[in-house]
Swiss-Prot record:
PROSITE patterns cross-referenced by the UniProt entry: ACT, CHORISMATE_MUT_2, PREPHENATE_DEHYDR_1, PREPHENATE_DEHYDR_2, PREPHENATE_DEHYDR_3
Domain Chorismate mutase: 1-92
Biological source species: Haemophilus influenzae (strain ATCC 51907 / DSM 11121 / KW20 / Rd)
Cellular location(s): Cytoplasm
Gene designation per UniProt: pheA
Name of the featured protein: Bifunctional chorismate mutase/prephenate dehydratase
Lineage: Bacteria, Pseudomonadati, Pseudomonadota, Gammaproteobacteria, Pasteurellales
Amino acid sequence: MALELSDIRQQITQIDRSLLKLLSERHRLAFDVVRSKEISQKSLRDVEREQQLLQELVQFAENENYQLEAQYITSIFQKIIEDSVLTQQVYLQNKLNEQRNQNLHIAFLGKRGSYSNLAARNYAARYQKQFVELGCQSFEQVFEKVQTGEADFGVLPLENTTSGAINEVYDLLQHTDLSLVGELAYPIKHCVLVNDKTDLNQIDTLYSHPQVIQQCSQFIHSLDRVHIEYCESSSHAMQLVASLNKPNIAALGNEDGGKLYGLSVLKTNIANQENNITRFIVVAKEPREVSSQIPTKTLLLMTTSQQAGALVDALLVFKKHQINMTKLESRPIYGKPWEEMFYLEIEANIHHPDTKQALEELKNYSNYLKILGCYPSEIVKPVSV
């Protein structure tokens, strides 16, 4: 006799709770691992060990005839490994950089429910900190609140996998004395959010931030005669649509934010790319020390001469010192037509002797060189088998 669906679901619930208990135990062991590495001074990330672990788990499941696909096993344990790595990084960083104020003040673009707000919450949760939300009307205001000390940190979007670089943030970095102290990647899932039951054929006006509009351009072009209203943030768009309460308008934003304003989801997954991710940076008034055991990035701002090959000569310094460059972005120099400055992101800690030597050599090939920040690489690249 077949089991009742309710009985099956009860068994699943019991198994899920057992899984949660085991995951919690594994999470706690990550602290034992990092304390051991703290004594031995071993590197935090051990890619060979991670690959070996995945291979052993896949083989074990096959030997035991668990009927689980290798890809399924690796995807689950890649996430578990990522949690372990980030947990260990946070432990070391908190020991190096004591935060006197337990209630952090974090500035971000928009109101509650904006993507920047959700990213700020994610960052605070990672470091297990309570925080006071400081919503801002512009990226410039985020910088100002940190500069004046009103905020401990500012969280800003730097680039998106669909729309590319956030040029306004890059340009503000040119003129700030703030330091980059962190990064995080946040998955972006745009939705059409409305007040009440309606359908897409009724929608004639869409509200959202320009970046969101750009990231959903293909979906928007598929609609007939729709008008775009640009807002200072996606949360501001949601607030407007909620307050206007009309059946012919919609906001483009995230589902969690929509719930805060009483909006319903009309359509999901409307971004041009399915895997739509925004990389956020975290800025502070003072730099934060990064443990030598942690994978680290450094962002530089540089200008070179206008001679042929000047940029190539500068970049060869990193090749000489075997330093990997993860980002090269150019922006115009205001007041100097056709001249550009370059943002370079490298996988290196500025306190490492080899990095110090490379930066000294780089000065010989640059007219201007500024270190914008050195921070933990918190985007964990998954290993594969």
